[in-house]
Structure formats: C-alpha cells, structure tokens
C-alpha cells in the first residue's frame, strides 16, 4: 500500500531524512517512534506529499507521490491524515467540518455528506455535538472529530502524526480507543506516536527512527522483546520503565 | 459667537447635500469592495511564491502607498482624459479603488499569514486544491481575523472621500461647500457636514464593535 524507498530530504543544508526505506502493506498497522527531532513527523508528511522529498521515491497505492505529474489532491483525498493539533476548521461547525471535503472534493450532495458525517460522529461518540464549533469541544473530542473527518473521505489508509501528543493524559484513552477500533477493523495505518501501549496492542510492526534514519524496523514482538540496535534499547528502557 | 450664525440655510439645501452624501457612500462602498477583491488577489500574488507575479504586486503596493492619496486623485484626473472621456466622479471611483487595493492587500496579507500552516495542511490532506483550501479554509478565517482592521481602513476611506473636493466631484463636502457659497453661509454648512461625518463614523464604529462580538471565532 505504502512503499517508501531510499527517501532523503534536506531543509537547506540540514539533512532531516537519510535513506529511509520501509513499507506498509494493506491492513497493516505500523507504529513509528523515536526521540523528538528524529524525522518521524517529517517522514509521515512526505507520504501524502505535504512535504516534498529530494531523493528516493514514495508510492502510495500504485501512485508515485513525488512525481510532478501526480494529481496530489486526488491522491490525498483517499489518504486520511490526523494531525497533532487536530486542525479542525474553527470557523465551521463540527458537522460542516466533516461535510466540506465530501462536498468539495468527492462531489457528494450536502444531504449525503451530512448523513455520512452524522454516522461517523456517532461512531466516535460526538453525535450530540454536531452543531457546536471546534473551540467548544475538549482536545480529545476534537481529535476524535478529526479522525471522523478523515474517515468521511472513505480513505484506503490512515496516517496519524502524533495524534495524542497535544492531549491531556485523561483524554488520550478516548482517542486511542477509536484508533484501536479502527486497527481491529483492518484499516491500513501508519502511526507516529509515543504510545507504546497502543503499539503493543495493535501494531504489526514498529519502526524506530533516530537522526533522520530508520534504525529499527521489526515485527512488534521482536521490537519489544529484544531490539537489535542499542539506540532503540536505550529509548525503550527510558520510556517503558515508569 | 454663535449669534451671527444662520442655520436656517440648512433645510433648503438638504436634498442637494443628500445627493453629495450618496456619492460619498457610493465611493466608499465601491472602493471598499473593489479594494478588498483586488487587494486579496494582490496579497495572494505576493504570497504565491511566484517571482514575477510577486514582484509586480509588491511594486504596485509600494508605489501606491508611497504617494499621497490627494496626488493620486489629481494625477489620475489630469492624465485620464488623454485616454478616455471621464467625469470627476468616475475618475474618483477608479482612483480610490486602485489606491485602497494597496492598503487592503497589506491587511489581507497579514490576515492570510496569521492562519497557521497546519490549517493549510489540513485542507490539503482532505484532498482540497490550493484554491479550494484558500477559498474554504484560509480566506474565511483571514477575513474574520481582519474585520476590525478592514473596517478601520474603511472609516479612513470614508473620511478621505472628502479629498475628491480637489477635482470637483460632488461628494458630501463639495455639496455643502456649494450650497454654503450659494447662501454665503460656508461656516454653518461646514459645521453641519462635520456633524454628519461624525454621526456616521461614530455609529459605524459602534456597529463594528457589535460585529466583532458576533463573528469572532471561538477558539
């Protein structure tokens, strides 16, 4: 589904990604972790072309992302993305947030879009707030709406960029619950997160990044059992021993 | 000192002054709408990253902002007749729109830049094109954020319309001036129009305060 091949990226003379190669198969849940500044958020933003890459190639569902001829809006319309800071549109009500992409991009009618939107809101438990504005909801609720907004486009895979990092601890669970449910339904997911509990529960593979490189790319059991690299061992021992 | 004043000249001149006021409003509204539309396009051109387009827009804005409005009004009125037949009123409408566009463009540029990058990414991420993202996500928020400044600029614009006096277009001030001279009561008429300008600007500013409360985005 997602193939990342020898991807390198620079910001000016600073290299943020170095020769990253990995893939996410259909139905697979891959967790990307690593210290801050390791390039994991940058890597996931390259997958749907929000960040350009200088070297290598990224292929999503058979379409090359870094080809100038690629219709990026079309590609992105079926790759859902959830951001660290939710990024709901603050000037639209919750249901409008879910309808806008369906109407403007997929060409659905308002009624159809609202109906589909309400179903998804019901699923993430926000139905009663459909007519409120994003600023009236808690962070956890906003992030669940953001997931519903991504799902409203009927995505073939979902990208999560630190979806719980901006949340109060007690709201993390409500967002993770929705994500676990998605994973168990067989959604293809690439998730940048520090939530190792989530990784243990639903991930198939875990990728560990440091200094813009993929240091470890292993099945979950192997990664949590005995990571190959020292750096990953250090990282795990620091975040797991509490 | 008011004993020598004769305010009885006001009622008979009202219909004529009204016409002047209507033109002042027409000028304000035309320059505001035209200015915001052209100004937004100029702002987008400057932010687009396109070198030639951005440079052209920047040159235009810098040029317009470096010349006093009164000079622009005079120059346009003096030069335009070489290219077309033009009344002072039409000349004023065009000059004001072009001039205000430069100021509105700077306001809109600040407004657009105040929208976080993440919002643009969110628009892109659900498959919107650049223009869809601008039109549905960025500009609606930029306008809301900028309403107080846009309206302040519009007050200044409304007050500046009195400058068309210089080219003889009949706005509120010119109309008052004409009737004042007709009756030999210029000072009374100036006092009267000052009160009109004050009443309009003051009530508009009350309206702006009310609007700000209504359309502010809950964050």
Regions found by a protein language model. Give the residues of each.
Chain A
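C-terminal boundary and immediately downstream tail of ABC-type ATPase nucleotide-binding domains
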Residues: 211, 221-242
């Amino acid at each position: 589904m997602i193939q990342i091949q020898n991807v390198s990226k620079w910001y000016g003379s600073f290299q943020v990604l170095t020769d990253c190669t990995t893939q996410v198969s259909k139905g697979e849940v891959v967790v990307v972790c690593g210290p801050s500044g390791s390039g994991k958020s940058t890597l996931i933003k390259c997958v749907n072309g929000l960040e350009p890459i200088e070297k290598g190639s990224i292929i999503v569902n058979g379409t090359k992302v870094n080809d100038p001829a690629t219709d990026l809006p079309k590609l992105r319309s079926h790759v859902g993305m959830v951001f660290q800071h939710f990024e709901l549109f603050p000037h639209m009500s919750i249901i409008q947030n879910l309808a806008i992409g369906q109407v403007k991009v997929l060409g659905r009618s308002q009624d159809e879009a609202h109906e589909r939107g309400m179903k998804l809101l019901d699923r993430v438990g926000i139905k009663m707030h459909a007519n409120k504005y994003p600023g009236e909801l808690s962070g956890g609720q906003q992030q669940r709406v953001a997931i519903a907004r991504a799902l409203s486009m009927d995505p073939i895979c979902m990208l999560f960029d630190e979806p719980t990092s901006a949340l109060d601890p007690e709201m993390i669970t409500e967002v993770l619950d929705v994500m676990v449910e998605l994973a168990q339904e067989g959604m293809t997911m690439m998730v940048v997160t520090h939530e190792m509990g989530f990784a243990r529960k639903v991930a198939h593979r875990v990728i560990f990044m440091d200094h813009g490189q993929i240091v470890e790319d292993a099945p979950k059991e192997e990664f949590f059992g005995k990571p190959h690299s020292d750096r990953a061992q250090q990282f795990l021992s620091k975040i797991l021993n509490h | 000192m008011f004993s020598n004043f004769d305010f009885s000249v006001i009622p008979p001149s009202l219909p004529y002054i009204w016409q002047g006021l209507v033109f002042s409003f027409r000028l304000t509204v035309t320059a505001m709408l035209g200015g915001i539309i052209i100004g937004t396009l100029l702002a987008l051109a400057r932010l687009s990253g396109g070198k030639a387009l951005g440079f052209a827009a920047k040159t235009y804005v810098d040029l317009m902002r470096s010349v006093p409005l009164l000079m622009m009004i005079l120059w346009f009125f003096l030069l335009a007749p070489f290219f077309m037949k033009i009344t002072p009123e039409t000349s004023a409408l065009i000059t004001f729109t072009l001039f205000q566009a430069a100021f509105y463009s700077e306001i809109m540029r600040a407004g657009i830049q105040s929208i976080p990058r993440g919002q643009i990414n969110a628009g892109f991420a659900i498959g919107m094109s650049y223009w869809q993202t601008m039109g549905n996500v960025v500009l609606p928020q930029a306008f809301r954020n900028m309403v107080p400044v846009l309206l302040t600029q519009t007050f200044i614009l409304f007050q500046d319309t009195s400058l068309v006096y210089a080219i003889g277009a009949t706005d509120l001030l010119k109309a008052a001036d004409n009737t004042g001279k007709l009756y030999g009561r210029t000072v009374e008429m100036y006092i009267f129009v000052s009160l009109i300008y004050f009443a309009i600007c003051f009530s508009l500013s009350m309206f702006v305060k009310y609007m700000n409360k209504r359309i502010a985005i809950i964050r």
